[in-house]
């Protein structure tokens, strides 16, 4: 009795679809390149030289995902900006230490490869890399039958940057009297989405048709995470930045203490900046208390920067010049060991 000859495609893995995707994304990858990148797509490893301007370079690396914002993007069939989120979550963590992002790699996993969806996602990743000034040097597209529900996929990002050793920003220079400058967020960025999805569920709204503050709810809830690399690197160049905090999971209470010495605390005036409308909606619809809002969401603030009072005017003018909305939201004060590191009043 003759047996049917099985192929990898019969098992659910379409190598031709993967090759088609590679061809589709080549032009997007090409527009992210940097002079330091050696070679192109297709190698077993990606090669990148260190920029020659660094005398004592230190590499800084990071990896992240986009959490359950991805679930919402899949459900709402909006795949073109989730890649920006992926890049943002990685590069914003790097620039906090003063690092210039050099290159980025992605991991895209799915049960059955949809070339159109994957190409949209990777185009978004390339868009994010262009915004951050880093090269998309490689990635992995994993088609894994039986591992994901139909239409689902998962993402992870990996980034490497470089900073001059003498210019690493680690918060050690923060002192009482420093001002706290906040850079506006575009919305929830990529944190708190399990709670956001729960609030959407209990509110009973249809996110595909609902409006919020005269804009599409779907557009606002899926607004891509802001990439702060270029404006923050300019701030570092022209002012004496003492610390930078990327407001991600854990919000104000958990992220700000990560960049403060033990002898100080951050005192923040919550009336000093604007909450994005989506945060007001979430708080009202979910009956979320104040502490939980500040622990889960950025509440309109994507980055907080500690710098001397005398540099505030220069910093605000520079940020305005490049189109960034910013506010002075507080200051650094002396603290005892047993005091809270963050006070919001």
Curated annotation (Swiss-Prot):
Chemical reaction(s) catalysed: 2-formamido-N(1)-(5-O-phospho-beta-D-ribosyl)acetamidine + ATP = 5-amino-1-(5-phospho-beta-D-ribosyl)imidazole + ADP + phosphate + H(+)
E.C. number: 6.3.3.1
CDD domains: PurM (cd02196)
Pfam families documented for this protein: AIRS, AIRS_C
GO biological process: 'de novo' IMP biosynthetic process; adenine biosynthetic process
An example Gene Ontology molecular-function term: phosphoribosylamine-glycine ligase activity
Annotated NCBIfam families: purM
Protein name: Phosphoribosylformylglycinamidine cyclo-ligase
Source organism per UniProt: Histophilus somni (strain 2336) (Haemophilus somnus)
Gene: purM
């Amino acid at each position: 009795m003759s047996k049917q000859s099985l192929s990898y495609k019969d098992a659910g893995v379409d190598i031709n679809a993967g090759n088609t995707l590679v061809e589709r994304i080549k032009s997007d990858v090409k527009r992210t390149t940097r002079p330091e990148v050696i070679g192109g797509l297709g190698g077993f490893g990606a090669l990148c030289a260190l920029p020659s301007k660094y005398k004592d370079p230190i590499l800084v690396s990071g990896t992240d995902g986009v959490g359950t914002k991805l679930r919402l993007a899949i459900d709402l069939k909006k795949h073109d900006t989730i890649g920006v989120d992926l890049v943002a979550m990685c590069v914003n963590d790097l620039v906090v230490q003063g690092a210039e992002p050099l290159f980025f790699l992605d991991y895209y996993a799915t049960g059955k490869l949809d070339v159109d969806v994957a190409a949209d996602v990777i185009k978004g990743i390339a868009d994010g890399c262009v915004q951050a000034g880093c090269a998309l040097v490689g990635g992995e597209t994993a088609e894994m039958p039986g591992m994901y529900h139909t239409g689902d996929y998962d993402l992870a990002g990996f980034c490497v940057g470089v900073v001059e050793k003498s210019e690493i920003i680690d918060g050690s220079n923060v002192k009482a009297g420093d001002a706290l400058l906040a850079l506006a967020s575009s919305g929830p960025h990529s944190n708190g989405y399990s709670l956001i999805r729960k609030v959407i569920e209990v509110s009973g709204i249809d996110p595909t048709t609902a409006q919020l503050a005269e804009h599409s709810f779907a557009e606002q809830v899926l607004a891509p995470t802001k990439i702060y690399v270029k404006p923050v690197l300019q701030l570092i160049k022209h002012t004496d930045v003492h610390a930078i905090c990327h407001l991600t999971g854990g919000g104000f209470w958990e992220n700000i203490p990560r960049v403060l010495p033990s002898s100080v605390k951050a005192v923040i005036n919550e009336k000093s900046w604007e909450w994005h409308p989506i945060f007001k909606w979430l708080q009202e619809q979910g009956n979320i208390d104040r502490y939980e809002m500040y622990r889960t969401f950025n509440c309109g603030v994507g980055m907080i920067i500690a710098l001397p009072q005398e540099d505030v005017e220069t910093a605000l003018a520079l940020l305005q010049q490049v189109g960034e909305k910013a506010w002075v939201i507080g200051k650094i004060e002396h603290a005892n060991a047993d005091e809270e590191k963050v006070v919001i009043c």
